[in-house]
Amino acid sequence: MNSVGRRGPRRANQNGTRRRRRRTVRPVVVVQPNRAGPRRRNGRRKGRGGANFVFRPTGGTEVFVFSVDNLKANSSGAIKFGPSLSQCPALSDGILKSYHRYKITSIRVEFKSHASANTAGAIFIELDTACKQSALGSYINSFTISKTASKTFRSEAINGKEFQESTIDQFWMLYKANGTTTDTAGQFIITMSVSLMTAK
């Protein structure tokens, strides 16, 4: 009887100590302070990196890429950079409606040829910073229709040194191909950097 009585308390003590040890282990496994630390650091880093692109209370810089497709060997037209840029709704119907002032600081115009090697002719472009021309007046800048090439224009050439109202165009780019057929020529792929100021 005594031996049975001794075994009983020992088991109870062992169970008690085991339960206590399990309870003490639980808060060690859940390391909440360490998890909270990295989350705050990551949150701060995201806030710093995305401030200019998410909130942008005072402005920022965006890069837009768009294309002008189905150019023919005898195509002509005008691309109006600003609120009239229908080829890039992300700019004309998007970001410019959220800011009072903007400036396009650079553009890269790539003519991507889809023409055959036998297609003759060239496509000329001209920058109009007065936004008044209705037809091409200069034939200095050109692309050979049968070859892919690109040209880059900085702020000095596109009236991009000063901010202006988001309700007016900054410049136009006129183009004209000198071919005599409607053969496929290619497309323009245009990349531009836009600075923004004063959110609405």
Curated annotation (Swiss-Prot):
Disulfide-linked positions: none
Keywords of the record: Capsid protein, T=3 icosahedral capsid protein, Virion
A GO CC annotation given for this chain: T=3 icosahedral viral capsid
Protein's cellular compartments: Virion
Main subcellular localisation: virion
Region of interest (Disordered), ranges: 1-25, 33-52
Keyword Iron-sulfur in record: no
GO molecular function, one term: structural molecule activity
ATP-binding recorded as keyword: no
Family annotation (InterPro entries): Luteo_coat, Viral_coat
Chain intervals with Basic residues compositional bias: 37-48
Note: The N-terminal region like those of many plant virus capsid proteins is highly basic. It has been suggested that these regions may be involved in protein-RNA interaction.
Family of this protein: Belongs to the luteoviruses capsid protein family.
Functional description taken from the UniProt entry: Major capsid protein.
Name by which UniProt lists this protein: Major capsid protein
Record organism: Barley yellow dwarf virus (isolate PAV) (BYDV)
